[in-house]
Amino acid sequence: MFLERLSPIESKIKILEEKLQDTNLIKNQKEYAKVIKEYNYLEKIKEKKDEYENIISQIDENQKILSEEENLEMKELIKQELTHLNLKKDEIEHTIKILLLHQDENDNKNIIIEIRAGTGGEEAALFAHNLYEMYTKYSEKKKWKTELINFNETELGGFKEVSFEIKGKEVFKKLKHESGVHRVQRVPITESNGRLQTSAATVAVLPEVEETDIEINEKDLRIDVYRSSGAGGQHVNTTDSAVRITHLPTGIVVQCQNERSQHKNKDQAMKILRARLYKFEDLKKQEQRSNDRKQQVGSGDRSERIRTYNFPQNRVTEHRANISLYKLEEIMQGELDLLLDTLALKLQEQALKDNPI
């Protein structure tokens, strides 16, 4: 029964209220903020639960009156009231179901985005650069701050790979669904015959992770230093300032060469490594949770095509939600909300189907 799912809410709130009175908790600001967030979240559900129960009570009362009422006019008025109450009940029930879709603890975090050129050679690298510009322009519109961490540029100005940070309110919540393979269809500037080509780039969106959020053993790291290189592979630094870090247990490799100092490059590489390891562990947990439903959550949505950008038709197709918008130019200029808002709604509806409450 729907209300049975909500029954433990009040006892959980009482436990959190007791925790919040603990003076030791207040000293630990990070843990205190976490408990406050959970408390506010449960209070929001309780508020809707109380509202829902009140509506149910009104429906029961009106149905009882209707069964005893003999006046036809009064009966009609009661029926109208019942219709209104049932609509209200459905609305509140839907709101509660959305709230019960577990809130992502990373939603308020800053992010690191990694974009890599896939199939398509130079054209794929140019498209990777286009995606980077799309996200930075979107960030400007949102008043978010972006910072370039690392990039490997081609001779024509494309990116073989690029990593950058975005800081702001609910950045991860807004952009977390961007992870995956982005495909482009257009005539490349390198194509003299004017033939349409399909290329791809891979996007990974990683929540930024504090040092205290994940433990990394120094013994598990192999750190190599080398000279940084620019477009075409030529060396641009006479000192070994570039850093490559390999996490031996997982085989994850991170490199950074864009800062002039080796120390700064190591710090940036460690920041990316923490984010990747956190994502790696999170995907393993998701895979375990989704095995019963036989979903491919844990396989990493980066391995599947999520979106196609067709330049000749000015069309963007979002494959996960079966959305096509003929507004490619606006989207590439950072008007991503045209797509993201509809996508979030579709994915929310799908989540409700996959997790019936």
From Swiss-Prot:
GO cellular component term, pick one: cytoplasm
Domain of life: Bacteria
PROSITE patterns given in the database record: RF_PROK_I (PS00745)
GO molecular function: translation release factor activity, codon specific
Reported modifications of this chain: Methylated by PrmC. Methylation increases the termination efficiency of RF1.
UniProt modified residues of type N5-methylglutamine: 234
Protein function: Peptide chain release factor 1 directs the termination of translation in response to the peptide chain termination codons UAG and UAA.
NCBIfam families: prfA, PRK00591.1
Protein name (record): Peptide chain release factor 1
Organism, as annotated: Borrelia turicatae (strain 91E135)
Organism lineage string: Bacteria, Pseudomonadati, Spirochaetota, Spirochaetia, Spirochaetales
Designated gene of the protein: prfA
